[in-house]
Amino acid sequence: MSNQVIIRDAVKRYGDFTALNGVSLDIREGEFFTLLGPSGCGKTTLLRMIAGFNSIEGGDFYFGDKRINDVPAHKRDIGMVFQNYAIFPHLSVRDNVAYGLKARHIPANEIKPRVDEALKLVQISHLADRKPNELSG
């Protein structure tokens, strides 16, 4: 399966509550991609749908040109790090953001500018050198 992720008109409901309604996005292979939003807006729900842990009530999910709506989680060949374990307590904010790039063997001279851009985008550049236990929320 291709590493590109394509989502068209994703819908997820929990009873009468609609958690996602018509979400569409394209994540290109190798793209540095982040889901940002307030608590309860559907970020984790969408990730769980991509990973195959949550059912899909509507829309189409693709890895490359292969539709994966009915592909079981164990056959999707992807991983998911759950929220509580996604941050390394011994690393700074900057190093936590850089971790995924280093793990993918991105050249060192490209990592700092990409991390700086991501921190600036989410307006936390001033927190770059703090450890997780020095942050709130």
Kindly give the residue locations of the regions a language model identified:
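ABC family nucleotide-binding domain
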Residues: 1-137
